[in-house]
């Protein structure tokens, strides 16, 4: 049986019009509007087996998600770190990409009410910032930048973090499914819509470099942004997943070396604006 989810801007969050000032729209409001547009487009899709349940934290965790965007996306961004889609113990709980609970609450300073998704899998309850499970990928990702940057404002001065796809897919057993696990036809329908949204988001933020976190995110970004004017550079970064033997050998060291190759370390550690290495 196909699974269909709807994500209307209903009681889970304010209507789109409430994000807009009468005379001017901020960059953060524009970004949130693009996310709501993407939600509306994705709500028309249906997904067959192996998908059992779909979560969209941009909907039910709207309050902390909105707080994340409005606090840290106030101006143009040179660099966008792009994940693929939410994890069950990260963004699915907090509404923040790679959003390990402790980092979101204690370092990023993000809070807010998290509602229950329309359909909740009993093995993957949404507990919001009370979730006791730590997401290893998120703890590694944000923990690295916490050590490198010191304060969130240093990181977000030139950078932002976003997921290509806002949806989390679960099998009937509760097992996490990545977009790569979906049937080819449905995967392409999903990611084509997300690709188009990424183009709009990158142009809105003025991004010059997209760093795909993981091979699939990098590949989709290259495909989506090919031929975009002005040109956007796309590079890759090893995913911090605990399922990656390479990441388990020392993701932080690998990440630092990669950022140094890309010329990004000065951008993340001092006040000067340093352009990414072409």
UniProtKB/Swiss-Prot annotation:
Record Pfam families: UDG
Family: Belongs to the uracil-DNA glycosylase (UDG) superfamily. SMUG1 family.
UniProt GO cellular component terms: nucleolus
GO function term, MF aspect, one: uracil DNA N-glycosylase activity
Function recorded in the entry: Recognizes base lesions in the genome and initiates base excision DNA repair. Acts as a monofunctional DNA glycosylase specific for uracil (U) residues in DNA with a preference for single-stranded DNA substrates. The activity is greater toward mismatches (U/G) compared to matches (U/A). Excises uracil (U), 5-formyluracil (fU) and uracil derivatives bearing an oxidized group at C5 [5-hydroxyuracil (hoU) and 5-hydroxymethyluracil (hmU)] in ssDNA and dsDNA, but not analogous cytosine derivatives (5-hydroxycytosine and 5-formylcytosine), nor other oxidized bases.
Keywords of this entry: DNA damage, DNA repair, DNA-binding, Hydrolase, Nucleus
InterPro entries in alphabetical order: SMUG1, Uracil-DNA_glycosylase-like, Uracil-DNA_glycosylase-like_sf
Region (DNA-binding): 173-187
Annotated EC: 3.2.2.-
Protein residues bound to substrate: 84, 98, 163, 239
Broad class of the protein's primary localization: nucleus
Protein name, as recorded: Single-strand selective monofunctional uracil-DNA glycosylase
Swiss-Prot/TrEMBL GO biological process terms: base-excision repair; DNA repair
Gene3D superfamilies: Uracil-DNA glycosylase-like domain
Subcellular location: Nucleus
Broad enzyme group: hydrolase
């Amino acid at each position: 049986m196909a699974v269909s989810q709807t994500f209307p801007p209903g009681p889970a969050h304010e209507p789109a019009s409430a994000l807009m000032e009468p005379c001017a729209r901020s960059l953060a409001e524009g970004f949130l509007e693009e996310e709501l547009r993407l939600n509306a487009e994705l709500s028309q899709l249906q997904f067959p087996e192996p998908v059992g349940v779909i979560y969209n934290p941009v909907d039910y965790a709207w309050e902390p998600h909105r707080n994340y965007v409005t606090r840290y996306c106030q101006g143009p961004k040179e660099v966008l770190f792009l994940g693929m889609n939410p994890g069950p113990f990260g963004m699915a709980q907090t509404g923040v990409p790679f959003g390990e609970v402790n980092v979101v609450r204690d370092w990023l300073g993000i809070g807010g009410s998290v509602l229950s998704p329309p359909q909740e899998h009993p093995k993957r309850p949404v507990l919001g910032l009370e979730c006791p499970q730590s997401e290893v990928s998120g703890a590694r990702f944000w923990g690295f930048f916490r050590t490198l940057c010191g304060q969130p404002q240093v990181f977000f001065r030139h950078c932002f973090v976003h997921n290509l796809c806002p949806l989390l897919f679960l099998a009937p057993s509760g097992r996490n499914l990545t977009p790569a696990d979906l049937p080819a036809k449905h995967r392409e329908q999903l990611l084509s819509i997300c690709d188009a949204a990424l183009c709009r988001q990158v142009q809105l933020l003025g991004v010059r470099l997209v760093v795909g976190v993981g091979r699939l995110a990098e590949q989709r970004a290259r495909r989506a942004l090919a031929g975009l004017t002005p040109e956007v550079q796309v590079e890759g970064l090893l995913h911090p997943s605990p399922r990656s033997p390479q990441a388990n050998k020392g993701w932080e060291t690998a990440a630092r070396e990669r950022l140094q190759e890309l010329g990004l370390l000065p951008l993340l550690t001092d006040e000067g604006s340093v352009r990414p290495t072409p």
